[in-house]
Amino acid sequence: MNRIYACPVADVPEGEALRIDTSPVIALFNVGGEFYAINDRCSHGNASMSEGYLEDDATVECPLHAASFCLKTGKALCLPATDPLTTYPVHVEGSDIFIDLPEAQP
């Protein structure tokens, strides 16, 4: 895994999301003080998940077609999406957030 610096904790208030412009682009969410990172592109359509609707139960709804995903597992919870989103491990160290990304393939 390749650990990257994402942002300060203060940049992602509770109940909010932040787009992290990495490769791949990541959507970082704060749900009740727990941070979750997923691929920012909906698996059904070309929509930014960081612009989606965050629910208290750690799910996010795509802003384009209302597909819902579990932030913990990436699982698609309702149609029209059937494919999961990639999730990434998140680490909080002091006041900073880091995300583990897979190593780049040669």
From Swiss-Prot:
Co-factor binding comment: Binds 1 [2Fe-2S] cluster per subunit.
GO BP, one annotated term: 3-phenylpropionate catabolic process
Pathway: Aromatic compound metabolism; 3-phenylpropanoate degradation
Top-level taxon of origin: Bacteria
Annotated positions binding [2Fe-2S] cluster: 42, 44, 62, 65
InterPro entries: HcaC, Rieske_2Fe-2S, Rieske_2Fe-2S_sf, Ring-hydroxylating_fd
Span of domain Rieske: 4-99
PROSITE patterns: RIESKE (PS51296)
Essential cofactor(s): [2Fe-2S] cluster
GO molecular function: 2 iron, 2 sulfur cluster binding; 3-phenylpropionate dioxygenase activity; metal ion binding
Pfam family, one: Rieske
Transmembrane parts of this sequence: none
Alphabetic keyword roster: 2Fe-2S, Aromatic hydrocarbons catabolism, Electron transport, Iron, Iron-sulfur, Metal-binding, Transport
Listed CDD domains: Rieske_RO_ferredoxin
Alphabetical list of PANTHER family matching this protein: 3-PHENYLPROPIONATE_CINNAMIC ACID DIOXYGENASE FERREDOXIN SUBUNIT, FERREDOXIN-RELATED
Quaternary structure note: This dioxygenase system consists of four proteins: the two subunits of the hydroxylase component (HcaE and HcaF), a ferredoxin (HcaC) and a ferredoxin reductase (HcaD).
Function: Part of the multicomponent 3-phenylpropionate dioxygenase, that converts 3-phenylpropionic acid (PP) and cinnamic acid (CI) into 3-phenylpropionate-dihydrodiol (PP-dihydrodiol) and cinnamic acid-dihydrodiol (CI-dihydrodiol), respectively. This protein seems to be a 2Fe-2S ferredoxin.
Family: Belongs to the bacterial ring-hydroxylating dioxygenase ferredoxin component family.
Record's protein name: 3-phenylpropionate/cinnamic acid dioxygenase ferredoxin subunit
Native source organism of the sequence: Shigella boydii serotype 4 (strain Sb227)
Taxonomic classification: Bacteria, Pseudomonadati, Pseudomonadota, Gammaproteobacteria, Enterobacterales
